[in-house]
Design a protein with these regions (language model features):
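Conserved protein kinase catalytic core
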Residues: 11, 51, 61-63, 128, ...
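Histidine-rich, glycine-flanked metal-binding segment
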Residues: 1-52
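Metal-associated gating/positioning segment near the N- to mid-region
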Residues: 47-112
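Hydrophobic/aromatic beta-strand patches that form the interior of the parallel beta-sheet core
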Residues: 40-42, 54, 87, 118
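Conserved acidic residues
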Residues: 39, 84, 143
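Divalent metal-coordination and catalytic microenvironments
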Residues: 6, 24, 46, 57, ...
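Histidine/acidic-residue-rich, glycine-tolerant segments that coordinate divalent metal ions
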Residues: 92-103, 108-158
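Poly-acidic low-complexity segments
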Residues: 41-46, 70, 133-137
């Protein structure tokens, strides 16, 4: 697919240009690109193309508060806004203090398939402000911890 005449915005600045996509990946970016025979062409004049966004503080509310937001509705909103990675806070019910809870959210996000989702785990077990032993049992793919608005009040806990 060839996207032509888009306003390209990136770290280098703004310019009009084209984007050639092959096999679902950007193969070329530049001005005056030509479509291969039979490739669809999209005229993006008046539209903006830019790198995806990352949101490090989201609330998908799973588990326990799905009446506010689910992994699917949150993923849809993120993707629609141009976000390809979101990081969900652990203030859920139960509090996301285990690898199993975090993994279930991330598995659901993979099933939905709209953006990459990381589920934070609480710094202290169930936001109790003291217990951190649960962190030793976390799998390596859990990359972020947060007390999300609670704060850790004791320096020796940190």
């Amino acid at each position: 697919m060839l996207i032509q005449h888009a306003r390209l915005v990136d770290a280098e600045g703004e310019r009009e240009g084209d984007i050639f996509i092959r096999d679902g990946h950007i193969a070329a970016v530049g001005a005056g690109l030509a479509a291969a025979g039979g490739e669809p062409v999209l005229d993006a004049a008046g539209l903006v193309a830019m790198p995806a966004f990352i949101d490090l503080h989201t609330h998908f509310r799973t588990p326990g508060f799905e009446h506010k937001e689910t992994v699917e509705t949150g993923s849809r909103a993120a993707a629609r806004g141009g976000y390809t990675f979101v990081n969900c806070m652990p203030n859920t019910s139960p509090v996301c203090s285990t690898g199993a809870i975090a993994q279930s959210v991330m598995d659901e996000a993979r099933r939905v398939g709209l953006c990459d989702v990381n589920q934070c785990v609480s710094i202290t077990k169930d936001f109790d402000g003291r217990t951190v032993s649960h962190l030793r049992a976390l799998p390596k793919n859990l990359r972020f911890i947060s007390e999300d608005g609670k704060g850790v009040r004791e320096s020796k806990v940190m």
